[in-house]
Amino acid sequence: MIEILDALDLPPAIFVGHSVSAMIGVLAAIDRPERFERLVLVCPSPRYIDDGDYRGGFSQAEIDELLETMDGNYLGWSVHIAPVIMGAPERPELAAELASSFCRSDPAIARRFARTTFLSDNRTDLDRVRTPSLVLQCRHDAIAPREVGDYVHRHLRDSELVVLDATGHCPNLSVPEQVVTAMRNYLAGT
């Protein structure tokens, strides 16, 4: 991402990232703050594993089981986990689309990506961000619970938290109008 911004030599960007991509944006903004005007972080999680008082959403055993299931039956895992991630049972087509996306991915790459994602711990990086940020969090998210959004907001110096009236980890797909409204309201205040 930094190489692209450097090559295009654009003015400071407004970065929008969802889930893992949100944390990639956080790391990029730490590395090259002059390249970013604002960060919009949709359902970010600096750590998915519970740790002491920190509630990331999963125990270590649950993550180990999830990764083991991926290793043993990637396609079955994809079909099972997609509705959990989407959290929109009234719109099964969204879960089907997500499962289909998983199934089109190279399983070896997807497993490596999942392992890196679920085992990473970027909590200490949050305090290093100097870029103003909007944190969008779903009211009910099985992947990154509400407490994660609160944690991210508390540890980003210049951040605003908006809790969306939504369930699931993909509000950009399930309630895009809420995401767009929150982004517009935030950016209008700049």
Set out the residue ranges of the language-model regions.
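Conserved alpha/beta-hydrolase "nucleophile elbow" surrounding the catalytic nucleophile
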Residues: 13, 17-19, 138
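Conserved alpha/beta-hydrolase catalytic His-Asp/Glu region
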Residues: 50-58, 68-128
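Short beta-strand/loop motif that positions the catalytic acidic residue
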Residues: 129, 135-137
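Flexible "cap/lid" loop of the alpha/beta hydrolase fold
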Residues: 26-72
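Conserved acidic catalytic loop of the alpha/beta-hydrolase fold
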Residues: 1-13
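Acidic catalytic loop of the alpha/beta-hydrolase fold
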Residues: 140-144
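Short alpha-helix in the alpha/beta-hydrolase fold that links the catalytic acid
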Residues: 115, 122, 131, 145-154
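Catalytic active-site module of serine/aspartate enzymes centered on a nucleophile-bearing elbow/loop
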Residues: 158-190
